[in-house]
Amino acid sequence: MSGDPTVLVIGGGATGTGVARDLALRGVDVTLVDRGGLAGGTSGRSHGLLHSGARYAEDDPRGAEECLRENRTLREIAGTCLRETDGLFVRLAGDDPDYFEEKLGACEEVGIETERFDADEAQAVVPGLSDDVAEAFRVPDGVIYPSRLVAANAADAERHGATVHTDAPVEAVETADGAVSAVRVGGDVDAALRPDHVVNATGAWADRIADLAGVEVGMAPSRGVMISVEYDGLAPVLNRCRDPDDGDIVVPHEGEAVLGTTSVPVDDPDEYETADWEVERSIEECAAMLPAVAEAPEVRRWWGVRPLYAPDETGPNRRGISRGFTVIDHADEGVGNLHTVVGGKLTTYREMAEVTADRVCERLGVDAACDTATEPLPGADDPDRLDEFVDRYGGTNPTDAGVVSAAADDD
């Protein structure tokens, strides 16, 4: 390739493509590279929940507020990258009623709209809900199709002048005089790029890029399993209303239900063991809320790795680590043109990208406002067009394979 970009974004998940889109809309010359297809890491291997913030309301109100803001924004700009479903937090007979009240009160304090149901009302909302249900409350959860969301961000970035390269792994980072001087990119690029600024948006792999640049990022990744089973007719997301534990969420995916998940620390987000107990426990626990999933035919299973940022780890299974995000300025470590963005959730990718782009533009002296909260994604209301974008950038991923690939097969 010819020419060096002003900004090089490393990482083609939701956050990386969000940063590329944001910068491109501000008129910045940006190139994005990813070692594989887009959304192939954490973004496309999640359970696909559009968070209302309720899962974190009592323990992490900052993270909950971020989720709620972006939940509302994405409903305005992302169209059929999402599915509006609502969610229920379900207390079963053996679950702590005080925790239910604490969760409900925390949601209301954060500003999350809720509606309380007794057992009969909850079973009317969700046919097949366990007879052990004691009470529930509704929140504005939803479903994200990450392959579409990420591809639409990349397509809009390119429409505004960005360059996007898949199958382009970073092989080396050179520094000189207090800055990244060159980034060696392999694969289809096969060149040394010399950007003015670099954004490390590689999620659970952020410490690897940081290591290449001679700086530190304290990642504490954890793996979790998802099992998709055949299940028609589930309308809302189901969340078990108890202290966070394995198997506490069921996400509807158009004829399927995604059951999850576990939280097991891993040292290497590429090479880690998986265990049958994770699958068995997730199914058993989810079936406590929705019994029919215990015998439902399995469609697929996959593991994903959470990109948790924790210089000081919290808890043996890392469930206590904040789901808020952090933008790290590596100027403090002697590399003045490198930012890393870590943590956060798929739901908050756009805000993460905006804050990162603000920092980069400030460093570059670019005076341009962010438009991504109000500018709809291309093809937002046209699923066929969105799926064309998905094909362009590497195809579907496990989270939404049953939706995106099915739509493509119907063409």
Indicate residue ranges for each PLM-predicted region.
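N-terminal Rossmann-like FAD-binding beta1-loop-alpha1 element of flavoenzymes
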Residues: P5-L32
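Flavin (FAD/FMN) cofactor-binding and adjacent substrate-gating region
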Residues: V90-A155, R159-H160, H165, V173-A179, ...
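Flavin-dependent oxidoreductases
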Residues: T175-A179, V185-V258, V266-E273, V293, ...
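Conserved Rossmann-like nucleotide-cofactor binding loop
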Residues: T15, L38, W205
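C-terminal catalytic lobe of FAD-dependent flavoproteins
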Residues: R242, H253-E254, D270-W277, R281, ...
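Dinucleotide-binding Rossmann-like beta1-alpha1 core, especially the glycine-rich loop
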Residues: H47-V126, V133, D245, P383-A406
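Central beta-strand plus flanking loop segment that forms part of the substrate or channel wall
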Residues: L50, G214-V237, C286-A287, W303-P307, ...
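Glycine-rich FAD pyrophosphate-binding loop
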Residues: A24-S46
